[in-house]
Amino acid sequence: MSYGVKCPKCGLMQLPGPQCKSCGTALGGPARPAGPARPAAPPRPQTPPPAPLPSDTNHSPGFSPPVPSGLEAGPGEGRQLFFYGSGGSLFGIHIVNMFLTVVTLGIYYFWAKVRVRQYLLSETEFEGDRFAYHGTAKELLLGFLKAALVFGVPLLLLGILQGILASVPVVKALLGLLTYAIVMVLIPFAIVGARRYRLSRTSWREIRFSFRGRALDFIKLFVTGSLLSGITLGLYYPFFDTRRHEFLVAHSYFGNQKFDFDGKGRDLFGSFLVVMLFFVPTLGLVWFWYQAKKQRYFWGHTSLATARFHSTVTGTRLFLLTVGNLFLLVATLGLGFPWALVRNVRFALRYLTLDGPLDLSSIRQEAQAATATGEALAGFFDAGLDLG
């Protein structure tokens, strides 16, 4: 019985023979009886191990090479906005604002609003950089005085005339219709003016936002949509709401880059019918479900260049936020307002991402002029939905 031998060079186990079958090294064993031996094979060249890539050196196993500047994220990767403010810090600002507003008989209100907006934006971060607010209290004060003079005085005079001519029903009714018509025009004017001002005073990486829509176009859209919503007993509302949102988004810019919106009101019509049918049976709770769905739809159809927004908010989360804020305000007799405001901002950002590639390096600043008159009107009619 013969035993196998191991080649001293390549380590191959084989039957005894004069040389290794693999590398041809002499084994010193007896020759095999079968056939002539094969010629010795040349030794295999020794290949050096591959050199590591530059991005693999001096890094931990989980290291990912940096994304090239400009795109900063690839398809499927979401960019998140973060808010680092706290209710306690905002409470300190809020208390001082309240005290100075009372002492100055309301004049400090404009400085108070600027301080809150500066705090909220400076604590909001995107891609490692904070936002900034550049509005001033002087602008807000002058805008308020201008709005009060141009629009407030005529409305006040109409109200006085209604009181004086109350005994003449026809004249009183006509004055009432005139007042309503003026307000219906001023509300969209205020919305556009406020958005134009606020975006023009907001920047990120020293590039400002802007709004370039014409007030007259939005007034036509708003008045027509309001009338059709009333005539159709509310059935036109999702179409009107979507067109209004489209106008405000599609005319907004970040530097020279335009935002886009491609949503359609018909996509929300079915959900709105559900709200109308179940609003009373659910004691209005179905409205939270609709608002969450609308937010997801609106954000999902909003894009900036090649990147698209994505929201994961749900009706349950929105309901819990509202109930929590209501309890907080009632339990603290209103002193918990700063914490409620911080909760709202964090909630708005927590479920929102910007997905897809975006070449931020190609965005350039484009100056746009804006006044605070519309901002003041938005305050009159409570038409603005800003955070401060």
Briefly describe each language-model feature range.
Residues 94-115, 222-242, 273-291, 326-343:
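Hydrophobic, aromatic-rich membrane-embedded alpha-helical segments
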Residues 168-176, 184-188, 192, 213, ...:
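Short, amphipathic alpha-helical segments
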Residues 103, 107, 153-164, 190-193, ...:
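Hydrophobic membrane-targeting alpha-helices
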Residues 154-183, 291, 340-368, 374, ...:
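Membrane-helix interface segments in multi-pass membrane proteins
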Residues 144-153, 226-233, 272-280, 319-331, ...:
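Juxtamembrane/interfacial segments around transmembrane helices
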Residues 53-96, 111-146, 193-224, 240-273, ...:
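Membrane-interface extramembranous regions at the lipid-water interface
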Residues 1-83, 354-388:
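Low-complexity, intrinsically disordered extramembrane tails and loops of integral membrane proteins
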Residues 100, 140-159, 179-190, 224-232:
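Hydrophobic alpha-helical transmembrane segments of multi-pass integral membrane proteins
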